[in-house]
């Protein structure tokens, strides 16, 4: 997330989208090789130049986001106004980020609210994963879910969804929305 890289990637996005300004520009992953000050200065320059209206961060832990906000405040730089993290019934590690977003007035977008399809009823104990599913194409992020404990939870979850007369995906999405 160095200055030159952020500027180049932003310019590329503007060109590909055929627009003069991005409404929201998110950094995707923390960069331990670049001081947060440098990243924020680069983002501030993009905002000051009118290329970006607002900035946010994806995949930061609460402590990293808090450090970024404190750095912005101390140096008078643009603040992250948005956070995006994985969040679902099966991945609640972003709770600290959610709490910080609420306290600081930041927006939050959960990604993978259906846990890569695990909360849709797609995956069944003892059955092969469906062709073309995330578990056949890119299993890495969700491999730890392939356990008896997860299947036990999913079976109870699917039973609850059925009792409510909704699909598991609907109940999972409702939970994410109500928990924010």
Walk through the language-model features, giving the residues of each:
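Beta/alpha (TIM)-barrel catalytic core signal, keyed to glycine-rich beta->alpha loops juxtaposed to Asp/Glu
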Residues: 30, 34-180
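Active-site groove signature of glycoside hydrolases
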Residues: 14-35
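Short, acidic/polar
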Residues: 2-17, 41, 65-70
């Amino acid at each position: 997330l160095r200055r030159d890289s952020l500027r180049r990637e932003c310019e590329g996005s503007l060109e590909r989208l055929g627009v003069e300004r991005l409404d929201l520009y998110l950094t995707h992953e923390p960069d331990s090789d670049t001081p947060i000050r440098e990243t924020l200065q680069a983002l501030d320059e993009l905002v000051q130049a009118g290329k970006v209206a607002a900035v946010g961060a994806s995949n930061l832990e609460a402590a990293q986001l808090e450090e970024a906000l404190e750095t912005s405040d101390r140096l008078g730089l643009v603040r992250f106004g948005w956070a995006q993290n994985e969040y679902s019934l099966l991945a609640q590690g972003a709770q600290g980020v959610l709490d910080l977003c609420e306290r600081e007035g930041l927006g939050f977008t959960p990604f993978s609210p259906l846990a890569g399809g695990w909360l849709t009823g797609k995956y069944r104990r003892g059955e092969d994963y469906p062709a073309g599913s995330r578990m056949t194409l890119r299993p890495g992020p969700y491999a730890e879910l392939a356990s008896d404990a997860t299947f036990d939870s999913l079976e109870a979850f699917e039973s609850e969804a059925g009792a409510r007369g909704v699909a598991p995906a609907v109940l999972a999405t409702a939970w994410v929305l109500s928990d924010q």
